[in-house]
Amino acid sequence: MMRIALFLLTNLAVMFVFGIILSLTGIQGRSVQGLMIMAGLFGFGGAFVSLLMSKWMALRSVGGQVIENPTSEVERWLLDTVRRQSEQVGIKMPQVAIYDAPDINAFATGARRDASLVAVSTGLLASMSRDEAEAVIAHEISHVANGDMVTMTLLQGVVNTFVIFISRIIAQFVANFISSDEESENSNGNPWVYMGVSMVLEIVFGILASIITMWFSRYREFHADAGSAKLVGREKMIAALQRLKTSYEPQEESSMMAFCINGRNKSFSELFLSHPPLDKRIEALRSGEYLK
């Protein structure tokens, strides 16, 4: 709760400063205030709705089945492993699901630490040893224990808010600059220019802003790897990452990649990857950089 309050206060403070600066430049105060409210509602609203629906959407997108009553030795082992690790980190046991996919992968999601979901692919259970699978599960449990889902949502909300706010402000300047006298009576100038410029800028700034969220996602992956190493041992986590190097390209939806153990490696720039390269993750574990 404190984390949410700090993020919201920081966002409001920065937006307040922006409002003062823009008011000094001559933009109508009511226009700025309304835009700040609208940007905040849309920016945070979309992020939080996605978070609240994350378990349902994740299960639906991969066709996952929550294990209610285990029917096999593998399912019993999976539940026992998640239960034991949850107790170790002090969280309520997440729901556990299995989904049919050939790639070696797993993910965690949920709106709260004590109302989360951990899902693993059939490819992971078939291809990994128990030690390797245990390390992957510990990685996902670490995501839950660290509150990474909520933190990523808050960061996305802040980023969304600023993308909307700054895009609309610049669009307002441009529209007013090229508008006729009659159109200038409208606080946003020419409405077609305003909407066109704001849409283009939101796309451009959205792409640039994703660099921030992807950097944070990569940073949290190192910490989740370290959390797994603390739970089950460094060598098990290294072995799991080495196994991932031989796996299929992940098939999960892009929106879920941030909390999968295995991310996509095909990108024209590492800046837009949700996961660090596997070799860097292995090296970080060996050096103990995030284990301190």
From Swiss-Prot:
Cofactor: Zn(2+)
Enzyme Commission designation: 3.4.24.-
Subcellular location: Cell inner membrane
Amino-acid positions noted as binding Zn(2+) in the UniProt annotation, renumbered to this chain: 139, 143, 221
Active site: 140
Main location: membrane
UniProt xrefs under InterPro entries: HtpX_protease (IPR050083), Pept_M48_protease_HtpX (IPR022919), Peptidase_M48 (IPR001915)
Membrane topology: Multi-pass membrane protein
CDD domains: M48B_HtpX_like
Transmembrane intervals: 4-24, 34-54, 158-178, 192-212
GO biological process, one term: proteolysis
UniProt remark on cofactor binding: Binds 1 zinc ion per subunit.
GO cellular component, one term: plasma membrane
Enzyme class of the recorded protein, top EC level: hydrolase
Family recorded in the similarity comment: Belongs to the peptidase M48B family.
Name the UniProt record assigns to this protein: Protease HtpX
Organism whose genome encodes this protein: Proteus mirabilis (strain HI4320)
Taxonomy of the source species: Bacteria, Pseudomonadati, Pseudomonadota, Gammaproteobacteria, Enterobacterales
Gene for this chain: htpX
